[in-house]
Amino acid sequence: MRARWALLEAGLSVHWREIELKHKPAEMLQCSAKGTVPVLVLTDGTVIDESEAVMRWALAQADPRGLLQAGEASALIAENDGAFKHHLDRFKYTDRYPGESRDEHRDAGMRILAGWSQRLKEHAWLLGAAISLADAALWPFVRQWRLADPEGFEADGQLAPLREWLNRFLDDPSFERLMQRADPWSSGGLQPMFPADATAVPLDQPLFHLALKGDWEQARETGTYQWSTRGMRLVEVGFIHCSWQEQVAKTFERFYADAGEVLLLEIDPTRLSAPLRADAIPTGELFPHLYGHLPIEAVRGFTPYSSDS
C-alpha cells in the first residue's frame, strides 16, 4: 500500500498487474525471484522489488510536498520494517507462528506504537511540522495493527495522537483510490492502469490555471509558480490544479468569483518537467494536475479573467 501511496503522491501512473500470491505468474518470478510484492519494472528494465525503494524512486521523480527533505526517516522505517512488523505478524497471524505468545507480541507492539504516539504530541507529523517519508512508510502498518485489535487500539489513551495522525491518512480522498481493486492478472489478459480513475494528459493542447495577480507577480520574480489554487500552496495540496479550456469558467466560479484581480495563465504542457496526470474529482470529472512547480517559461501568456470573460 505504501508503494502505491507514493506513486499517487508523485503524480505517476503505472501498468497494474494484480497478483494472486498463491499462484504467482512466471512473468513475475522472472522479474524478481523473491516472489514478493510490490515489484516495479521500469521502462529501461530496471527492477525495484522493495516497497521503500519504490517509494524513494517515485518521490525522486516528483516530491511536491517535500517528503524526502522533511527529515531523516531511515531509523523510524527500520524500526517499523524490523521490530514492529515482527510483532505485528505474530500478533495478527498467531496461527502461523506456533509457540509464539500473542499477548507478548501485542505488548511489544503497543510499546512501539506508544513511542510513535509520543512523538506526535509535539508535532503534527513523526519528524516535525511537515509530512515526511517516515509518515508515509509507517501508516499502512499502523492501520494493520488497528484492524487486528480495533478495541485495544481505540481504548488506549496513550495512542490518541497516533489515532489522529492515522485518521488524516484514512480520511484523505487518496485512501479510496489506494483501495481500488483489480482482478488477478494473467498473461495476455487485461492490464489496467493505477490509479484506475486517472488518465494521461494530452500534450498537444494547452492547459490553463487561474492565479491571483499578486501570486503571479511574485512568481515572475522568483522564476516558479507554486500555488495549487486560491489560498492553497503546492506544498500543502501536492499538485497545481489546472483546467482544460472548457473547465475554466466553472473553476473560476468555484474558487475565484470574489477574489479580486485574477489572471488566466495559458500553459504549454510540453515545457513542463514535473509529472502531469488527469485525476478524477468526487463528481468523476477529470482535471489535469501538475505534480510539481510551474516554471515561468512554460506559461505562454496571461490575461485578466472575470465572470464576463
Region spans (language model):
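Residue-level recognition of oxygen-bearing side chains
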Residues: 53, 161, 174, 247
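GST-like fold's C-terminal all-alpha helical module
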Residues: 76-171
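Hydrophobic pocket/interface hotspot
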Residues: 7, 169, 248
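GST-like domain detector, emphasizing the conserved glutathione-binding G-site
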Residues: 1-110, 117
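Acidic/histidine-enriched, glycine/proline-rich intrinsically disordered or flexible terminal extensions
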Residues: 179-202
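Conserved, structured core segments of small domains
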Residues: 199-309
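Short, hydrophobic secondary-structure boundary micro-motifs
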Residues: 66-70, 88, 126-129, 176-180
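Short amphipathic alpha-helical face segments that pack within enzyme cores
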Residues: 1-5, 140, 247
